A protein has these predicted regions:
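Conserved beta/loop motifs at nucleotide-recognition and modification sites
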Residues: 1-205
Length: 205
């Protein structure tokens, strides 16, 4: 590196730079993109620049005969990341729709997603919801919560909307159940796939 004269920064750009990059592509293709479409696109593809580039290429091909990209277009063609599927799962837990919860879970298993990772993401999601709900109860607005947690306003709004379906006591109880099942699965006292199913059946049944 010293001989070449400078180091290259391969870190992921921030959201502002990614937005500029992607919007330039949209504009170059002669399209527009709604804010809610961009929010959903970013949520589904922000794990890497390669993934984002590939998903945008796919999206632009899908809307080749349209003037703009809508939320419905993104939902129709862009692949969901695992954490987005887990959010959907929890939405169905909130509405007590156990068949949908189990359908989503088995879909993730079919793509070789490890049950322990799914359980970890469920725990992470409820942890976030608990912290956000607590901050909101102290009078903090979405922007303040987003700044303190280092995440996007859009994510805070989505999580707070979902968190309204649970009391603080329910979230605490669910996290205790999840932590217990996680420990039992990791020590071999219960099958890891069954651990997630037991948690979902208890809370969505």
């Amino acid at each position: 590196i010293a001989k070449a004269g400078s180091a290259v920064d391969f870190s992921m750009p921030d959201e502002r730079m990614l937005t500029s990059w992607m919007m330039a592509r949209v504009k170059a293709a002669g399209k527009t993109m709604t804010r809610d479409a961009w929010n959903e696109f970013f949520e589904r593809s922000n794990d890497s620049m390669d993934h984002m580039d590939m998903e945008m290429e796919k999206l632009l091909s899908y809307v080749y005969d349209k003037d703009g990209i809508t939320l419905e277009d993104v939902e129709a063609i862009c692949t969901k990341q695992v954490h987005t599927k887990v959010f959907d799962m929890i939405s169905f837990v909130a509405s007590k729709n156990l068949p949908k919860v189990l359908d989503l879970y088995h879909d993730m298993l079919a793509t070789k997603e490890p049950p322990i990772r799914i359980l970890a993401l469920i725990i992470r999601q409820f942890d976030q919801m608990y912290v956000m709900k607590d901050m909101a109860s102290q009078g903090m607005n979405v922007q303040t919560i987003a700044g303190k947690m280092g995440i996007r306003d859009f994510i805070v709004r989505k999580n707070l909307g979902l968190a309204r379906n649970f009391t603080m006591e329910q979230i605490r109880a669910l996290l205790e159940d999840a932590a217990d099942l996680d420990e039992r699965a990791k020590t071999g006292r219960i099958n890891d796939q069954l651990a997630v199913e037991m948690l979902m059946i208890k809370w969505a049944g």
